[in-house]
Amino acid sequence: MKFISFNINGLRARPHQLEAIIEKYQPDVIGLQEIKVADEAFPYEITENLGYHVFHHGQKGHYGVALLTKQEPKVIRRGFPTDNEDAQKRIIMADLETEFGLLTVINGYFPQGESRAHETKFPAKEKFYADLQQYLEKEHDKSNPILIMGDMNISPSDLDIGIGDENRKRWLRTGKCSFLPEERAWYQRLYDYGLEDSFRKLNPTANDKFSWFDYRSKGFDDNRGLRIDHILVSQKLAERCVDVGIALDIRAMEKPSDHAPIWAEFK
């Protein structure tokens, strides 16, 4: 099975990228983040002829996630059980019958957080990671495999930072989000739960592979970016991981998202 995660940065703006992903990679499951469209206005004309079941959890103008699956899921869940009616639309889950067992797929657009000093955005990021952790520990049956994918907005190690050492130091000094010690501690709890980074499993020392590139500074042109999009899997799946990648060819298209899709394949 092949899984692709892509922060599309506006579904209506980038149907050409979604179509190219499907044509080239033929994934079984696609997780989209930042679709920026309300559920009642979802553009089914973009997705109806692609060969997928389509599920979404969105709001007008911001955030929003979607799952596209070749097979019909047994269950779809939108949001965390602890979400209130004002919660941002950032997470969607599906249970799929697979050769690996009953697989829970969690697709998330994790808060960016802005900076340690931000009064609302930084605590919101911490809460989102805590809500995910609580969901895993209280709701998920660990005997079943699980895959978490999305724009997680954290660079887990210094290998995942490609913005230059001066910028790295400045971001840390000013408390800018992506690789703060607190963020890495939240992320580490996912590893402690038993999840593995599919990309790192097959590329343990790669330090030049990134999934996000800043528009304004034209970071894509000289490979200046961050690896903040991830596919994390439980051990049973990690053992079956045969290939991973970052689809830079899709990022190189006209009118692209600032993120590149990432993918992982399991056999």
Curated annotation (Swiss-Prot):
Q: Where is the active site?
A: 109, 151
Q: Where is this site: Transition state stabilizer?
A: 153
Report the co-factor binding details. Probably binds two magnesium or manganese ions per subunit.
Q: Which cofactor does it need?
A: Mg(2+); Mn(2+)
Write the Enzyme Commission number(s) for this entry: 3.1.11.2
Taken from the record, one Pfam family name reads Exo_endo_phos
Site positions per UniProt: Interaction with DNA substrate: 259
Q: Annotated site (Important for catalytic activity), which positions?
A: 229
- Which residues does the annotation say bind Mg(2+) 1? 34, 258
The alphabetized list of GO BP terms reads: DNA repair
- Example of a GO MF term: endonuclease activity
Question: Key word Metal-binding present in the record?
Answer: yes
List positions binding Mg(2+) 2: 151, 153
Which transformation does this protein catalyse, written as a reaction?
Answer: Exonucleolytic cleavage in the 3'- to 5'-direction to yield nucleoside 5'-phosphates
User: Which keywords accompany this UniProt record?
Assistant: DNA damage, DNA repair, Exonuclease, Hydrolase, Magnesium, Metal-binding, Nuclease
- How would you summarize the oligomeric state and partners of this protein? Monomer.
Say which family it is in: Belongs to the DNA repair enzymes AP/ExoA family.
Q: What does this protein do?
A: Major apurinic-apyrimidinic endonuclease of E.coli. It removes the damaged DNA at cytosines and guanines by cleaving on the 3'-side of the AP site by a beta-elimination reaction.
Q: What protein am I looking at?
A: Exodeoxyribonuclease III
Its taxonomic placement starts with: Bacteria, Pseudomonadati, Pseudomonadota, Gammaproteobacteria, Pasteurellales
